[in-house]
Regions:
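Acidic/polar, glycine-rich intrinsically disordered N-terminal extensions of enzymes
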Residues: 1-86, 222, 548, 556-561, ...
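Active-site cavity-forming subdomains of large catalytic enzyme subunits
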Residues: 2-11, 16, 87-290, 321-325, ...
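Core structural elements
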Residues: 15-17, 63-79, 171, 303-314, ...
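Secondary-structure capping and boundary motifs in well-ordered enzyme cores
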Residues: 17, 35-36, 82-83, 94-97, ...
Length: 581
């Protein structure tokens, strides 16, 4: 609970002086009456100690205190405590045997018991009608999904987040068309898995069949897009794009990616004895101009390697974590990401659509790539190369991934989540952490400048679903090439800069994501948004373009029903606190 005696700038950062920050951070992130400042010190000291460099604690704290480095939910809530682990996102792969199906169910149960959200690969399980050992035939993947569904529902994870799991299957699996219906509350209840999320794994071979007009491929693809438009999922993992761009360490060890995690930004190897972990936190792009000439990215990579070591040392003797620890020790994969991308663009008067945003994408993500790799080489010199990195000069197989950051964006100054556009410029949000009225900070500055920061105008924006396109007082206002408001004719129109998710051309979103993917060795939680009346041909075009641009994963498809300003953020998946980097 928030302590009213805490002082701004002393017990919590000045930029956190908002109801959103206070309600969110006091909703499960603090322990034993500690203040936010105490929590930041707890994390910084613990991680520095794991690196055997206690002198780094002050530097880590300063990055967090300034709002430059934003901690993933489990990192903030659990690091340095005995109530949970600093990593709570995992991926497990199930082999085609009753023994492994049962073993992985137990593994998932034990991971979930300790706060884990779990991605499950079920593609190896034989399809319905296939012969099994002895007499009889298989019932396919659907009954086993029901087992996992019941397990995750029954496993309590405490107060920070509830149980969650996703199941991954290849679109060419013989059971795909049955599997894609398991979230529908109709038919045989024993074949329903209403609590599982879904991810379709799509290979290049299938996409080439689709382009060639193969009828079976077209039927499966159409069903996938139909479900994504109606329900938001299944997520998509483009397996070919992913494995073609695997890092040197994976190629040397013949490691492949078969699945993704519950938030679709992790693309790491899994097999019968290796389960991946998601070690995440984010750089705050809203404050990019403050930190771009500092050592933040380099030091944040050291920080995450320390977080991973904290996980390994605490989990190595815990039942159910053997496969996760084994994978973490051999690869030490990290996922340094970003949040506040749309906030940064708006702060600088840059429209999401267009060349300037593309240039900024290359500038920032190339810098992150260079600096994280420099840090990993330095880490390898100090601590050595793990098994899978042997001979590469790196400490980590992977370094970069962009998580959803829905909660983290509230704890970072009420900025935009991840690389995603704002769903609305104002909305009422109901979540597990409280109920808030959230207004776009940059738009509020514009309204003040123009002289329209009134309840009536904000009510109009809210009534219009969070859009400013109907605010006539903004007509004629532009940004010049230095990001300053002006009424001169030249420049970017304010209304373009403050377009919402659904108002932005989704092909431009995909093009920008394709540029970004070139610099990210894991993946990005990339949502798409379409109006309810969007024709199937348009969805098809955007999804195929994503594959062609080399994008590795697609997260949710948002339609009109989940993009209205009054429920925009409530529609964001609460399950992804596990990797809210």
């Amino acid at each position: 609970m928030w302590n009213s005696d805490w002082k701004k700038g002393e017990d919590y950062p000045a930029w956190g002086d908002t109801d959103v920050y206070k309600k969110t951070i006091s909703g499960g992130y603090l322990v034993n009456g500690e203040s936010p400042k105490d929590a930041y010190w707890r994390v910084a000291k613990t991680v520095a100690k794991r690196l055997y460099k206690p002198e780094l604690a002050e530097k880590f704290f300063e990055y967090i205190w300034k709002g430059w480095l934003c901690l993933a939910s489990p990192v903030l809530s659990n690091t340095g405590t005995d109530r949970g682990l600093p990593i709570s996102c995992f991926g497990i792969d199930v082999a085609d045997s009753i023994q492994d199906i049962g073993n992985k169910n137990l593994e998932m149960m034990l991971l979930a018991k300790h706060g884990g959200g779990v991605g499950i690969g079920i593609n190896q399980i034989r399809a319905a009608g296939k012969r099994i050992t002895g007499n009889g035939t298989s019932d396919g993947v659907v009954p086993f999904c029901k087992i996992y569904d019941s397990t995750i529902l029954a496993t309590n994870q405490g107060s920070v987040r509830r149980g969650a799991a996703s199941v991954n299957i290849n679109i060419e699996h013989d059971d795909f068309l049955d599997w894609v219906e398991i979230r529908e509350p109709k038919g045989d209840v024993n074949r329903q898995s209403l609590n599982l999320h879904q991810c379709a794994v799509v290979g290049d071979k299938f996409m080439r069949r689709l382009e060639a007009g193969d009828q079976d491929a077209r039927q499966r693809w159409a069903k996938l897009l139909q479900k994504r438009k109606a329900t938001g999922e299944p997520y998509i993992l483009f397996k070919g794009n992913t494995n073609k761009s695997n890092p040197e360490a994976y190629k040397k060890n013949s490691l492949k990616v078969h699945m993704t995690n519950i938030c679709s930004e992790i693309v790491l190897h899994t097999d019968e004895s290796h389960s991946f972990v998601c070690c995440l936190s984010s750089l705050n792009l809203d404050k990019y101009d403050e930190w771009k000439n500092t050592n933040l990215i380099y030091d944040a990579t050291w920080f995450l390697d320390g977080v991973l070591e904290e996980f390994i040392q605490r989990a190595k003797n815990m039942k159910g974590f053997e496969n996760s620890v084994r994978s973490a020790e051999k690869g030490r994969a990290l996922g340094l990401g970003v949040l506040g991308w749309h906030s940064l663009l708006q702060k600088n008067g840059i429209a999401f659509e267009g060349l300037l945003a593309q240039f900024k994408t290359r500038e920032i993500f190339s810098k992150i790539k260079i600096e994280t790799e420099r840090a990993s080489r330095a880490l390898a010199e100090v601590y050595g190369e793990p098994l899978w990195c042997s001979g590469t000069g790196f400490r980590n197989t992977h370094l970069r991934a962009v998580a959803p950051t829905v909660s983290n964006s509230k704890l970072s100054g009420n900025v935009s989540p991840g690389i995603e556009p704002w769903a609305a410029n104002v909305f009422t949000e109901q979540s597990a952490k409280g109920t808030f009225i959230r207004k776009n900070n940059e738009l509020k500055k514009v309204f003040r400048k123009v002289g329209i920061d009134t309840k009536e105008v904000w009510d109009k924006v809210l009534a219009d679903g969070g859009s400013v396109q109907g605010i006539k007082q903004l007509d004629g206002w532009n940004y010049d090439n230095r990001g300053r408001l002006t009424q001169e004719d030249d420049g970017e129109a304010v209304k373009n800069v403050f377009k919402t998710f659904k108002e932005i051309n989704q092909l431009e979103l995909v093009r920008q994501a394709g540029i970004r993917q070139d610099y990210i060795d894991q993946s990005v939680s990339l949502n798409l948004a379409f109006p309810a009346e969007a024709p199937p041909r348009w969805l098809n075009q955007v999804h195929i373009e994503a594959w062609k641009r080399g994008i590795k994963t697609l997260y949710y498809t948002r339609t009109e029903s989940v993009l209205r300003g009054d429920i925009a953020a409530a529609a964001m998946d609460p399950d992804c606190l596990s990797c809210d980097g």
